[in-house]
Every structure is written in structure tokens, then in C-alpha cells.
Regions:
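PLP-dependent enzyme catalytic core of the Aspartate aminotransferase-like
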Residues: 145-149, 154, 158-176
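PLP-dependent aminotransferase class I/II
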Residues: 36-116, 120-123
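Short acidic/glycine-enriched loop/turn segments that link adjacent beta-strands
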Residues: 51, 126, 160-163
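Short beta-strand-to-loop capping motifs
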Residues: 59, 132-136, 169-171
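Active-site pre-lysine segment of PLP-dependent enzymes
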Residues: 1-13, 17-49, 63
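Conserved PLP-binding catalytic core of the aspartate aminotransferase-like
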Residues: 105, 113-149, 165
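Hydrophobic residues in well-ordered beta-strands that form the structural core
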Residues: 15, 41, 124, 153-155
Length: 176
């Protein structure tokens, strides 16, 4: 990421860290070094607050001022008092947050190991989902069979990913 930022000083580089809490590495440490870096995070994934539309951006004072100058023109998801209170509470309860993220990561790794026993393969995941493929059974076939059993995964009929399923990690009970 630093290589991209350093070689593109004439543009704003936005790093979306929606899934960083699940094991990724944040670019926050680069903020003091690069004026053209904007790091954005959401409460939708690791804080399980997708419907609240809460997130934040970190960057130079100039970038943040520019965002503030246009936020009411382009932001159709302005925050109401309930969202602000719930977002604040989620930040203040760091113990619960860390326990929740750890549980999701542990469930993801357990599920991945179980699915590997069935022949599935996965690229490395640092998110709350797995991208799964089976060498002998087409993803579309698995998708349709799962849907018939009320198991909902995502299938993308697109080149390069049409033999993969996106499996969101739920509770241990749901994943069993």
C-alpha cells in the first residue's frame, strides 16, 4: 500500500479498511507520512452495525476539511441521534468488540478447516467471510443445492470468480 501511495502523490489514495479488524493490517500508521492518504473504516462489519450506516475517515487536516465541506451534498446517509449513540457505545465497549471479532475469526478458521476436509479450497481470508471453491463440483451447482436447503451463500456468475462462493461467517450453530 505504501508503494501505491508514494508513487501516486498527485492523487488521493483511499484505503477501505472495512475488514481490517478480522486480521488485516491498518494503513493508519502511514497517515502522518502521506498527505494524500485517506483511510476509511465502517462499523458495518466487525461491529455488526450494517444498517446504521456508521463509519469514519482519517486523513490530513486538508482532506478531512474537504470531506466536511461536501458531506451534506453527497452523503445521503446522515447520522441520526440513535446511530450516534449506538456507534459511541460500540466504541466504548472494547472488551465486547474484541470478544466478538475473536469469535468470528475462530469460527471462520474452524469452518474453513471443516470445509477443507470436504475438498474445498480457499484464498487466505482476513474478513468475516470465506471465498470457497471446490475442484470437482461447480460453484453454481453447490449454490443451487444450498439454496434448496435454505442455506444462503453468494454466487457470482462473473469471469475469474464464477467457480467461487462467498460464505459469510455466522454463529457456530449457523455454520454447523
Amino acid at each position: 500500500i505504501e508503494d501505491i501511495i508514494s508513487h501516486n502523490q498527485d492523487v488521493i489514495v483511499i484505503v477501505d479498511e472495512a475488514y481490517v479488524d478480522f486480521g488485516g493490517h491498518s494503513a493508519q500508521e502511514l497517515l502522518s507520512k502521506y498527505e494524500n492518504l485517506l483511510v476509511v473504516q465502517t462499523f458495518s462489519k466487525s461491529r455488526s452495525m450494517a444498517g446504521m450506516r456508521i463509519g469514519y475517515a482519517m486523513g490530513s487536516a486538508e482532506l478531512i476539511k474537504a470531506l466536511n465541506d461536501v458531506k451534506y451534498s453527497f452523503n445521503s446517509y446522515t447520522m441520526n441521534r440513535t446511530s450516534i449513540l449506538l456507534g459511541t457505545a460500540s466504541i466504548e465497549d472494547d472488551v465486547y468488540f474484541k470478544e466478538t471479532v475473536e469469535k468470528i475469526v475462530n469460527t471462520r478458521e474452524w469452518f474453513k478447516a471443516e470445509m477443507k476436509k470436504l475438498g474445498f479450497t480457499f484464498p487466505d481470508s482476513k474478513a468475516n467471510f470465506l471465498f470457497a471453491s471446490h475442484p470437482k463440483v461447480p460453484a453454481k451447482e453447490i449454490f443451487e443445492a444450498a439454496r434448496e436447503k435454505d442455506i444462503y451463500v453468494r454466487y457470482f456468475d462473473k469471469p475469474r470468480i464464477n467457480n467461487y462462493l462467498r460464505i459469510t461467517i455466522g454463529t457456530d450453530e449457523e455454520m454447523e
